[in-house]
Amino acid sequence: YVILDRADDDHTEPHPSDNPDASSRSVLYGVVQHSGAELSAHETITAEQDHWGSIAQLAAEYETVAAAAQKDRWAALIRDSGLDDEQADSVLVSDAFGALTAELRRAEANHHDIDRLFPRLVAARGFDDAEDIAKVLHYRLARATAQTAGSARARVAPRLIAGLIARADGPMTDQMRQALDERHRLIEQRASAVLDTALTDKKPWTRKLGPTPDEEKAARRWRSSARVVAAYRDRYQITDTSPLGPPAQNDAQKVDRARAETALRRLTAKPGRPEQDRAVAQRQGRDLGL
């Protein structure tokens, strides 16, 4: 692992789901109350649905519920990681705790063994000169998990919803699991709806996706990649005629944009260049911590 003890403030900015004092039940109740609409297929798969059915909203709800659902698990991991009690307490009350747990979820979605990896990151170097241990751990974790786990030849796809959002796994209450699964389903449905509507309406940005292949298997791959681009546009409310719109505004969007760029590159790859395109995508992923 590459270990550097420089906390990156850009990666620890406040997140909508960062509220370490909220109970799981109150968080779930708050999300449902703020959803503004019943989570039904009828209301969420139409192209004209309002803000409450967008991926921007559904992803924010998913991440808020995920943070509450996994809070106890990550707290136990931190307390058993080799930190002393005072250090562990400081991590749990840090403003960077939410960003750290989001990074843990992302790393697990990339198939890293968090229970083994995290204690090794704690033991890599002390924290005597650290102003915020949570920020330092966030930085170490992001550096150590910059690529999906596995060898270059046997690397498996990360567990992402609509190609963008890290899936929350592990033990949690049935109520939390149901809330996450429901939003997972709605996000995937919304991505399909956005793509289908754009194709039907012949939106200018869809021209950059290239034609749908005739062969069934190739057509499925094409649609899978095109849905990532559609999901990215919906999550960040992009109306530009180019597929990915203007430059990303923050680190979270940069990561999502890199994933969408990789998907777009697969759609537009020329025959005979798969290895070159794959190398570009992997290099870009390393730079952004994908």
Where are these regions (language model features)?
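C-terminal accessory regions
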Residues: 1-76, 82, 119-120, 126-129, ...
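Long, low-complexity, charged/polar intrinsically disordered accessory regions
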Residues: 72-124, 128-289
